[in-house]
A protein has these predicted regions:
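ATP-binding glycine-rich loop module of kinase domains
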Residues: 2-52, 56
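Conserved structural core of kinase catalytic domains
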Residues: 44-45, 56-113
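C-lobe/activation-segment region of protein kinase-like
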Residues: 141-224
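Conserved hydrophobic "DFG−1" position in protein kinase catalytic cores
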Residues: 18-19, 31, 80-81, 89, ...
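Catalytic-loop of the protein kinase fold
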Residues: 124-140
Length: 224
């Protein structure tokens, strides 16, 4: 199997590869095996187990997560390659062609309907993603299907108190609403904007910034 390095990783970060099998199919591989011994045997083992467990649970209930997840070793996992750009890349490509974000021509309304449906399915299964306000974490698969990647901030919610679970779910919902307001403002009501303001207030003042571990990234997220 051929592998191309996508992200070089680091002290706390997995190396990320695009691998191509003999059948020509591509997949993403995240590998902690080259991290220092203590990191790979503690954080690395935990993050590999955790992401594999979550994506396997979610793979049976929604198409909004990467499929085909397998645990390659105690320190590595693989998942299906999403054949499409991120929302961030889609926007930048369209802006270079002269399209304005608020024109309504970059993303169809069906994309955001599927975005909302995917979030609802994830929440019903007992999970929250918590980083869907970052346009790099939403891939645009063929047919305008959103796929949510980078699950290192995600949490299971099944045993949380109801008020906390709902507050965290609103963070995910606000991510979808943020992008709908940016790219299709004609579809957003005054009530939607008030909900977005409330969710952003909670995220900024009561939710600690996430610790970026487990996967190296480059560039900045699409600002709202």
């Amino acid at each position: 199997m051929d592998r191309e390095l996508l992200h070089s990783g680091g002290f706390l970060n997995a190396r990320v590869y695009v691998a191509r099998g003999e059948d020509g199919r591509k997949r993403i591989e995240k590998d902690f095996s080259e991290c220092p011994w203590l990191v790979r045997n503690t954080l690395g083992r935990f993050l590999v187990w955790r992401e594999t467990w979550m994506l396997r649970r979610l793979g049976g209930v929604t198409k909004a997560v990467p499929g085909g997840v397998v645990r390659l070793s105690a320190f590595a996992l693989a998942e299906d390659f999403v054949d499409g750009p991120s929302m961030r890349e889609t926007y930048f490509r369209a802006s270079r062609e002269g399209l304005k974000a608020a024109s309504g021509k970059i993303f169809p309304h069906e994309f955001f309907d599927r975005f909302d449906a995917g979030i609802s399915e994830i929440h019903a299964a007992g999970f929250v993603h918590l980083d869907l306000h970052n346009a790099r974490n939403v891939m645009v698969a063929p047919g305008w299907r959103p796929v949510f990647v980078d699950w290192q901030s995600a949490l299971p919610t099944r045993f949380m108190p109801g008020f906390l679970r709902r507050a965290l779910e609103r963070i995910d919902e606000a991510g979808a609403l943020k992008f709908r307001a940016k790219f299709r403002p004609m579809d957003v009501s005054a009530g939607d904007r008030r909900r977005l303001d409330r969710a952003n207030f909670f995220r900024r003042h009561f939710w600690l910034p996430r610790l970026r571990i487990g996967e190296a990234k480059s560039g900045s997220g699409l600002s709202g």
